[in-house]
């Protein structure tokens, strides 16, 4: 879902910011991931699809595990695009109880557009695989969908009176 939006599946894509490859990973981010996560990829070969996807997936897992995203899918997607620091700031400035309101109030116009497009891409892939979409059902119900494959409930409701706590939903 990210690779479609980031590069339209072009392994040689390069952004104005210097991000490269299918998942549009910047060389500095790749170097950080080697230090932080101990992966064995080569930051000098970001146009190699296998190498690039390893870095991109590892970065998704990294931002998934940050306290600022809490593993919540819209926040993880936003963090992949905007970086982790803005997400922490937005969490403290905006009501966190409604995930759709979070998406619509993202101050960066690029990221505000990016999140629903990546979600749409993800849902299309789910549908092609004949899978139900827990994340889509969660958003319709006003719940925060969690990053796929995480242990525990597939979605949570954030208590607006205590934004750091979440109530699980299966």
Language model: regions and residue ranges:
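Catalytic glycan-binding domains that act on GlcNAc-containing polysaccharides
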Residues: 1-169
């Amino acid at each position: 879902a990210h690779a479609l939006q980031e590069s339209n599946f072009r392994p040689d894509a390069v952004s104005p910011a210097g991000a490269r490859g299918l998942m549009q990973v910047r060389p500095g981010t790749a170097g950080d991931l080697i230090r932080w996560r101990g992966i064995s990829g080569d930051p000098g070969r970001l146009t190699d699809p296998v190498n690039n996807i390893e870095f991109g997936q590892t970065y998704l897992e990294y931002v998934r595990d940050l306290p600022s995203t809490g593993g919540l899918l819209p926040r993880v997607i936003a963090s992949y695009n905007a970086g982790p620091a803005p997400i922490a700031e937005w969490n403290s400035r905006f009501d966190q109880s409604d995930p759709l309101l979070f998406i619509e109030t993202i101050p960066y116009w690029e990221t505000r557009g990016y999140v629903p497009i990546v979600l749409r891409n993800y849902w299309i892939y789910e549908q092609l695989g004949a899978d139900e979409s827990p994340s889509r059902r969660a958003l319709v119900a006003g719940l925060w969908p969690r990053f796929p494959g995480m242990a525990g409930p597939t979605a949570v409701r954030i208590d607006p009176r205590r934004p750091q706590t979440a109530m699980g939903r299966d």
